[in-house]
Structures are given as structure tokens and as C-alpha cells.
Regions:
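A glycine-rich helix N-cap at a beta->alpha junction
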Residues: 168-173
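Conserved small/polar residues in nucleotide/adenosyl-binding loops
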Residues: 175-181
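Short, Lys/Arg-enriched N-terminal segments with co-localized hydrophobic residues
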Residues: 17-23
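Active-site-proximal loop->helix
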Residues: 159-163
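Structural motif
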Residues: 24-77, 106-152, 177
Length: 181
């Protein structure tokens, strides 16, 4: 298969006088496309989650965006995932830790379908919490305040905050960090 790709690229590539061979980036991208899987009906499956704090936090967010409870098995338990579960709880999501297997967590989105505002989220130093949860907070029924460890204020948040403002978020910075964004 690899040989066939090289052959295909060679046929589509252009040669320049100095010997450099190149091809159109879009042509190269098209060569590597594959059809995305499609489910013709709602899925009912059990997925074993790998032990990654970054992936575990993303799975928690995806589960919180659903309309029914989601059981996550093999969730990594770390400070970052605890901070994510606490952040989701602050928004009205139930994160129920299995009493027998603490790496199994059932995530129950708010029954009214809305995230709850009027709360404060502590991000610690968890990048996934400080970058993903503010987007969820845009859908809350009231304002949500965010805070973190002192070192978190040095994190580059300007692109995230600018993007949220472009989507209509009202952001008020309430701290005196020398470099707030």
C-alpha cells in the first residue's frame, strides 16, 4: 500500500529545475482521505476508555453534552479529571463514581438539558478544564466564574477567550495578573 501511494504521488508531483519534487497539498490530502464510518441508527455500545487525563477529560465533556447517562469505564483518576468532574458538577452534571471500581464513572447530564450558572469553576492547572469548560458555560442559564492555581494565570488563554467572544460570550476579567491574556 505504501509503495502504491509513493507511485501515485510521483505521477502527480511536479519537478522543478533544481530537482525539488512537490505536489499540490490538496492533492496529497485527497490521496489520504478515507470514508468516515456512519451509523444508520443510534449506537448502544460499551467503550473502554484508555488511561489518559487529556482523553478522559474529553470523554467527560462529550458525556456531559449528551441527553442520557453515559457510563465511562477505565477513566483515569487524576487531579485534572477530578477538577473536570468538579467543573461539570458545578454546571449541574452528575458524575457518579462507582463504589466498587473507581475508574468507572457515570455521567448524567442535567435533566432540564441546560447547564447551570450562578456558580464558580476552579480549573487548577488543568488545561482541558480551562479551555473546554468555558465553552460549555456559554450554554449555562446564568454567569459562571472561573479561577485556577496562581500559575494558571500565566497560561495563554487569549485565543480561547477571543474565540468565545466571537461566538457571543460576555467575558469579564476580574484579576490583576500582569499578563491576563
Amino acid at each position: 500500500m505504501e509503495h502504491a501511494r509513493k507511485t501515485t504521488y510521483a505521477r502527480r508531483a511536479r519537478r522543478f529545475p533544481h530537482g525539488l519534487v512537490t505536489m499540490n497539498h490538496m492533492e496529497a490530502l485527497h490521496e489520504n482521505l478515507w470514508p468516515a464510518p456512519y451509523a444508520g441508527k443510534p449506537l448502544n455500545a460499551t467503550v473502554v476508555v484508555p488511561g489518559s487525563k487529556s482523553l478522559s477529560n474529553r470523554y467527560l465533556i462529550l458525556a456531559a453534552l449528551g441527553h442520557r447517562p453515559v457510563r465511562l469505564v477505565g477513566l483515569l483518576r487524576s487531579r485534572d479529571t477530578e477538577l473536570m468532574m468538579d467543573a461539570l458538577r458545578a454546571l449541574g452534571v452528575r458524575c457518579e463514581i462507582d463504589e466498587q471500581v473507581d475508574t468507572t464513572v457515570t455521567v448524567v447530564p442535567p435533566s432540564d438539558g441546560r447547564f447551570h450558572g450562578g456558580t464558580k469553576v476552579f480549573c487548577g492547572l488543568a488545561g482541558t478544564v480551562m479551555r473546554f469548560v468555558p465553552g460549555l458555560a456559554m450554554f449555562a442559564d446564568g454567569p459562571v466564574a472561573f479561577d485556577g492555581d496562581e500559575q494558571a494565570y500565566a497560561r495563554p488563554m487569549k485565543p480561547v477567550l477571543d474565540g468565545l467572544e466571537q461566538l457571543g460570550a460576555c467575558i469579564c476579567l476580574l484579576y490583576t495578573s500582569p499578563s491576563p491574556r
